Amino acid sequence: MKPNLNNTSLKISAGLVKQFPADRIPQIAFSGRSNVGKSSLINSLLSRKNLARVSGEPGKTITINFYDIDKKLYLVDLPGYGYAKRTFEDKKRWSALTDGFFTANKNIDSLRLVCQLIDSRTGPTEDDLDMLYY
């Protein structure tokens, strides 16, 4: 049965691994450099303008955001990596959170796909390649 895209909401903005949803709903995660368009893509896929917060300033997504699609699917917006006007400690915390999504997530079996977004203007960076091979 197809999910109803009109029944979409932000389930949680998780700043800690223990805040990840405990249910077994399938997940599709979006990964990429800061400001590559992960949040914009989620909004576009769902035909929504303001569901996923978008900014022209890199580093605005600082949590892992789980968007509930009709209680049948989560679209997961991961924090970007690379350039952001944030402290080293902030970047380290985001990196640990993203790492925890892949290594300490009790529902990792629910992850069906990771969409790695690459900036077409620059091509894959070393950070992008590191993420691809992660």
Which residues fall in each region the model found?
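Conserved G1/Walker A P-loop phosphate-binding module
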Residues: 1-89
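Conserved C-terminal guanine-recognition region of P-loop GTPase G domains, centered on the G4
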Residues: 92, 96-134
